[in-house]
Every structure is written in C-alpha cells, then in structure tokens.
Amino acid sequence: MTELLNFSFYQLLVFVHIILFVLWLGADVGVFMLGQHFRKREKYDLPQRLVLLQLLVNLDMTPRTAWALMVPLTITMVDAGGWWDVPGWGVALSWAVGAVWLWLVWDAHIHDQTERAARDRKIEFVLKIGLTAFYLGLGILSLSQGEPLMPVWLATKALMFGLIFAAAIMIDVAFKPVGPQLGKLIAEGSSDETEIPLRKTMDTTRIWVWIVYLLLLATAFLGNMKPF
C-alpha cells in the first residue's frame, strides 16, 4: 500500500492541475458548440434555442469554476515544486481569493437576473482585472529580472496565463450586449431586426473565445514540453 501511494504533494497538484485544464477546455468547447447550434434559427424554433442557451449557461459554470480554482492551485504548485518560495500567507491568500471568486461566480449564477447577481459580477470583474495585472506583472518581471519565476518556460507560462485572463475578460465585455438583445428577441420574436445584432455580438465574442483556446493550448504545451 505504501508503494502504491508513493507520490509527492507536488505530483498530486500537477494531477489536479491537468484535471482542471481538461474540465476548463473540454467544457468550454461544449459551450462553444451549444452556442453554434443556438445561432441556427433555420433549424431550431425559438423555444428550442432558448433551451440550448440555458444548457450553455449551466455548462459554462464548469470552465468558470476551473478557472477560479486555477489561481490558488498555480500558486501552491510553484511553491510545492520549489519553483518559487511563496510565503505561507501568500499561499493562504491565493486560496482565499480563489474561494471568494468561486463564491461570486456561483452566487451570481444561482441568483441570475437579480441586483445581487449584478453586484457579484461587478466585484468579480474588478477581481479579474487585479488577477490579470498580477499574472502579467509576474511574468514580465520574471522574464526581465530572472526572478521570482525561473526557468523561462515557467515565467512565460505566467505571462500567458495573464493573457488568458485578459482575453477571457474581453469575452465577458463582448458578450454584454447579449442580455438586452436576447430580451428583444424573446419579446418581439425572430426576425432580421432581432437576430442580426445578436449574431454580430456572438461573432465578436467568438474571436476572443478562439484566442483563449489558443492561449490555453500554448500554455499547456509550455508546461508539458518545457522547451526553454
């Protein structure tokens, strides 16, 4: 039994990191596909498309949850792996931030279409901007000064994680008009007047979605291959 459990805490964290990556990217592809089908007004009637949209919103909680958990996990990993001697309070703070973010995401989802959800999302938006600045700053500082993160692949990975944050924020920004546009579609029915603006918004959002996918794959490549 001892031999079967012969693995380190760092190895366990790496395993969890891989699981979260799979859930993040895999579920997000599912969200993308549901969005693709929602766009097909010639194939589905409006009630069917609204069901697809509800499934999309529910499934989207998986990548959002994985994203929030990635923050404390990455900090804990670099500390446990000996890549960066993070003080205990820093690790604890990262888990506190992750817990708050997770609560905001799920509270907004449970109380959707309420002032409480709107408040949660505003706080989450500010939090994500702060985390974007943190990871971008960490990556740039490490690449320019050679610390606190080294080797180069790890510093680059931190920088790219910050870019993922930035692109994901742009997804939310680009998607924001969907609420009123969808409300108009439901109230007035399907027509070029209600469908075309919604389609344009979704097309713009898809650009940022593809950018996130590419950055996720590039980050995974760096973590696995460690090319430099």
Predicted regions and their residues:
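Polytopic transmembrane helical bundles with strong interfacial aromatic enrichment
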Residues: T2-F228
